[in-house]
């Protein structure tokens, strides 16, 4: 047996012994009749205490005679004979407890407290004071075990090191990792900030179906499910777009939705099959209005949540305070592949030759517009580090966007990039029902030719357009990728509480 195998065996034995001991302690608690009491109430969290009292001297605290009640998980304990120091962790952070045998009811310190384990959840009451080192602490006069933890916490010095374990057992990651807790607090603040921003601009939040008879609103492979009562195959939605635009037809002129989308595709540092999007639709507006809205949204969120418009990410600093870069797709190709002749992008054969020269395998179903888009993604996308809007997307890859009035081969559409990643997609909406029907048919033809991400023909949506969709602009922003940027996270699984994982066999 190798040394590493021996260490692994020892670790299993130690864990089994620990589990056995903790279960025996719980059995003893059950005999006492109250293993999981539910009558303790706290009046402060740790962050509230630090905010209100960290600046005060010990003499001030003694004069104030502040009595508090707190509850949380015991993370550390230093027993020094008749007295101990405990670190208690709650939703707001950590607070130190000073526990003295002589200040607790008889028998509590030796017969109960000393037998409790790290990870147990405690309730404590006492008076605030500061130690000689100036640390705000609670001098306990009451201490109770509220929940017995049957499993030990991750090693206090190394935390939860295995990345996969962090995702599978997110609860342990949140207990032991301050940065992980901070990430998900920021995520919550971003969601709340978006809602505040949108409502402030007179948008109404709505909910649309998660299961759809016809998946639409994006080019992606859907998940299929079956509705037993209707005996009908249905699809988890890939986007809410077509339902949201039906609402604009119905007279709700500014709507938005924050919810999940599902796409039956690969998993990567940027992709999770189940992800969160914010989509909005605004009547009597065009894509240029949404470029302004997007800039304002990101600038506002950064300032309100992070306190600055300069957001660090790896070796870069994204500056949301400056005007965002704006390039057409062709300008971006030329900028990052200077040898490209712009005229060559207008011709199928020459565009195909460029694509193949840079390693792109051109599919038979692709037209010239799709090829140009693939060239852009290959040569330019990774270089779009600072906030950048790319405009003038080909109509071929924009089946729901309005054609440009001057050049019908392109659309009034933009995609928004930061850090070399697409964060958002917006455009002036196609409201010509006949044009939309033809583009749906083109998508059906592409699907028949082998494109399994092409859209279905949605006759009901075309019928809605025939009743009249006012001039409208729409925008979708990936919340997960936005959170990655604001938290300096480099994989999407770090910003999704429970990312998709293969089951452990």
Swiss-Prot record:
Its BP terms in the Gene Ontology are: lysyl-tRNA aminoacylation
Keywords for this protein: Aminoacyl-tRNA synthetase, ATP-binding, Cytoplasm, Ligase, Magnesium, Metal-binding, Nucleotide-binding, Protein biosynthesis
Residues forming coiled coils: none
Q: How is the cofactor bound?
A: Binds 3 Mg(2+) ions per subunit.
Chain sites annotated for binding Mg(2+) 2: 422
Q: Where does Mg(2+) 1 bind?
A: 415, 422
- Gene3D superfamilies linked: Bira Bifunctional Protein, Domain 2 (3.30.930.10), Nucleic acid-binding proteins (2.40.50.140)
Q: Where in the cell is it found?
A: Cytoplasm
Q: Where is the signal peptide?
A: none
Say if the entry is tagged with keyword ATP-binding. yes
Class of enzymatic activity (EC top level): ligase
InterPro entries on file: Aa-tRNA-synt_II, aa-tRNA-synth_II, aa-tRNA-synth_II/BPL/LPL, Lys-tRNA-ligase_II, Lys-tRNA-ligase_II_bac/euk, Lys-tRNA-ligase_II_N, Lys-tRNA-synth_II_C, NA-bd_OB-fold
One protein family per Pfam: tRNA_anti-codon
User: What Enzyme Commission number(s) appear in the record?
Assistant: 6.1.1.6
Q: Which domain of life is it from?
A: Bacteria
Cofactor dependence is on: Mg(2+)
Alphabetical GO CC annotations of the entry are: cytosol
Looking at the keywords, is Membrane present? no
Reaction equation(s) it catalyzes = tRNA(Lys) + L-lysine + ATP = L-lysyl-tRNA(Lys) + AMP + diphosphate
Q: Which cysteines are joined by disulfide bonds?
A: none
Q: Which GO terms describe its molecular function?
A: ATP binding; lysine-tRNA ligase activity; magnesium ion binding; tRNA binding
Give the record's subunit note. Answer: Homodimer.
Q: Which family does it belong to?
A: Belongs to the class-II aminoacyl-tRNA synthetase family.
HAMAP family xrefs: Lys_tRNA_synth_class2
Q: What is this protein called?
A: Lysine--tRNA ligase
> What organism is listed for this UniProt entry?
Enterobacter sp. (strain 638)
Designated gene of the protein: lysS
